[in-house]
Amino acid sequence: MTVIAVNQAVAAAKILLKMKLTPFNDKQSRESIINLLKENALPVDDIWENTLLFGFMDDDAFSGSAGLEIFGDCALIRSISIQKSLQGKGFGVILQKELEQVAQSKNIRCFYLLTTTAEEFFKKQGFMTIQRDEVPDTIRSTSEFSSVCPSSAIVMKKILVNE
């Protein structure tokens, strides 16, 4: 293992030890999360105030973020994003699991998402590919479904509790 790899592993371990998904509602945090999404080429045009944004930080910078739009007992996941230097180290899995705990505390029974790049990642997390017409109208009518993500995006669902 090279010195660089060891330093990266140590930095990742430090983040992991203090990582806790936290809601961020203030304007400055929202802007920082939006910048992280942009760095990862993820959509930000329709991140409104009703999108619950969560993240974890390393020092004063966001290292990971995720968003939820809640519709009754289901939620639309908005871009799970990890700082590029931390990608491939398991942080996305941890962030997604933390998001599930938040969702279950809000009595959310299922997640929906759209992806153009992360189908395999989400399959490993228990999501299944579905057709667009299987998504509830309230979620299908969001700008994420109707205009932000391309029609070629893959639609996925995960049941958090038995329906």
Regions from the PLM with identified roles:
Residues T116-D133, I139:
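Conserved active-site alpha-helix within GNAT-family acetyltransferase domains
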Residues A61-E69, C74-S81:
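Conserved beta-strand in the GNAT
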Residues I80-Q87, T117:
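A short, internal acetyl-CoA/4′-phosphopantetheine-binding micro-motif in the GNAT/acyltransferase core
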Residues A103-T116:
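Conserved GNAT acetyl-CoA-binding A-motif
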